[in-house]
Amino acid sequence: MEIKRDAYLQQLIERKDNGMIKVITGIRRCGKSFLLFTIFKRYLLENGIGSDHIIEIALDGIENEELRDPKMCFKYIKDAVKDDGKYYLLLDEVQFMPRFEEVLNSLLRMSNIDVYVTGSNSRFLSSDIVTEFRGRGDEIRIYPLSFAEFYSVYDGDYDDAWDDYMIYGGSVSYTH
């Protein structure tokens, strides 16, 4: 069963195509990657965006290690854009790339790319993250699961769910 994070999806939808970098922040394991790569991607596909116009990069995976290089990543993204249609860049764990701010600001100069990034280190959790993009960033802060969200996918009774929630908190990883 999938946890619904409709409020966060709605925030992404409201900011779609606004010309700013959507910066999704939150502590580790709170569901940022799932929100971006599963829930938001599904929304894009269901609303007519072709999979060939969605560019997904997870920088924490070894398979994308070479894309941690700023110039390689920028070239990869630029080469993935094949026409004048709108493209959606979903870039996970951007803090793995040195000088990521330069890459993101360069991408903003390409009018047909809508940029979404996640990050979870202390730099991304600070209130200064949006200012790093010189007024071109839009932060969406993700929180751990509420008890209602946790219980909606919990396999057990209410009291056991409450006990586990009090022990483990709202970590998305516990519910899987």
Model-predicted segments: where are they?
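Phosphate-binding site recognition
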Residues: 1-174
